[in-house]
Amino acid sequence: MTIIRKSHPLMKMVNHAFIDLPAPSNISSWWNFGSLLGLCLIIQIASGLFLAMHYTADTASAFSSVAHICRDVNYGWLIRYIHANGASLFFICLYLHIGRGIYYGSYMYKETWNVGIILLFLTMATAFMGYVLPWGQMSFWGATVITNLLSAIPYVGTGLVEWIWGGFSVDKATLTRFFAFHFILPFIIAATAMVHLLFLHETGSNNPLGIPSDSDKIPFHPYYTIKDLLGVFIILASFLTFVLFFPDLLGDPDNYSPANPLNTPPHIKPEWYFLFAYAILRSIPNKLGGVIALVLSILVLAFFPLLHTANQRSMMFRPISQLLFWTLVSDLFILTWIGGQPVEPPFIIIGQVASILYFSIILVLLPVAGLIENKILKW
């Protein structure tokens, strides 16, 4: 087996990526989320494939086809809830993975980090289009509101929105193309994830200390395969418990009503994992300004490598940066809460303050903290 593993062209690639890969000896469980994201993607593609076999991408029958999956298809309800809650699991792992990258300075691997940002955008696009497919009230109005934001783009906005819609409103053409894109994008995500891994394996993994670990490397297998498997079992057990006991906890009750263009839901809001960005969008009274802030709320991640001023890579020994990091995490929780609230006082001002704080911490306070810490440590 050893001979094949090191000589066969295909096996050699797998060997270099997952078996004989030299890995730092001190990476913690925060490094498990890469493999868990791979697991999430596999779960989503597999469950999505089975759903697509029974789903009908037509405005007249989309809602009914989802009901048919839940009622008449063998274990259809389970596949549907695994897929719906799998998206939430995906984003939980994604946000923890990004948080780890920020805390330990993994963003200094610029190519890996930038491909990761592209992956985040692709995943968000996929999740948004998937939410439209059941053709419930929140599906329809969410699609209308979010696609309509593009009309804020000067000169080409209106034409662009109608081009995406395939008509003058969200209708059959929109649903059909969203299904097509929702089906193809996960495979594009899988290919991009391979590029992400390719760039990562050029440099090797970072570690909690943020120092070079070339002098102390261990093989990925069996050490980290076993460690990843532990994470997989914990996540799968938690996930299945959630799916089987609280399948609708994260969903919107409005989405159990068929789409009705004549009846607007009282509070239009996206799924929980987009609420922080939605809160930032709503905190700016101007439409174009809101759209720019929405895009920047994710694109701001690209500024981390450019604004790294500290002489240490990791935040492990930088208390001021640690304080700011956890303030940022708290701020994101506040933004998520505000995104789900109606647009009325005191939520408006809380959202605006939280949005300003979000950009201030990333663009101003963290770089300044890095410089202060350099001075304190006489680096």
UniProtKB/Swiss-Prot annotation:
Residues involved in heme b b562 binding: H83, H182
A cellular component term from Gene Ontology for this protein is:
mitochondrial inner membrane
The record lists the membrane-crossing segments as: 33-53, 77-98, 113-133, 178-198, 226-246, 288-308, 320-340, 347-367
Q: Which UniProt keywords apply?
A: Electron transport, Heme, Iron, Membrane, Metal-binding, Mitochondrion, Mitochondrion inner membrane, Respiratory chain, Transmembrane, Transmembrane helix, Transport, Ubiquinone
Q: Which domain of life is it from?
A: Eukaryota
Molecular function per GO: metal ion binding; ubiquinol-cytochrome-c reductase activity
Q: How is the cofactor bound?
A: Binds 2 heme b groups non-covalently.
Ligand binding (a ubiquinone):
H201
Q: Which residues bind heme b b566?
A: H97, H196
According to its UniProt record, which cofactors does this protein need? heme b
Keyword Ribonucleoprotein applies: no
Protein localization: Mitochondrion inner membrane
Which InterPro entries does this chain map to? Cyt_b/b6_C, Cyt_b/b6_C_sf, Cyt_b/b6_N, Cytb/b6-like_sf, Cytochrome_b, Cytochrome_b_C_euk/bac, Cytochrome_b_N_euk/bac, Di-haem_cyt_TM
Q: Name one GO biological process term.
A: mitochondrial electron transport, ubiquinol to cytochrome c
Q: Which family does it belong to?
A: Belongs to the cytochrome b family.
Q: How does it assemble?
A: The cytochrome bc1 complex contains 11 subunits: 3 respiratory subunits (MT-CYB, CYC1 and UQCRFS1), 2 core proteins (UQCRC1 and UQCRC2) and 6 low-molecular weight proteins (UQCRH/QCR6, UQCRB/QCR7, UQCRQ/QCR8, UQCR10/QCR9, UQCR11/QCR10 and a cleavage product of UQCRFS1). This cytochrome bc1 complex then forms a dimer.
Q: What else is known?
A: Heme 1 (or BL or b562) is low-potential and absorbs at about 562 nm, and heme 2 (or BH or b566) is high-potential and absorbs at about 566 nm.
Per its database record, what is this protein's job?
Component of the ubiquinol-cytochrome c reductase complex (complex III or cytochrome b-c1 complex) that is part of the mitochondrial respiratory chain. The b-c1 complex mediates electron transfer from ubiquinol to cytochrome c. Contributes to the generation of a proton gradient across the mitochondrial membrane that is then used for ATP synthesis.
Identify this protein by name: Cytochrome b
Lineage, highest ranks first: Eukaryota, Metazoa, Chordata, Craniata, Vertebrata
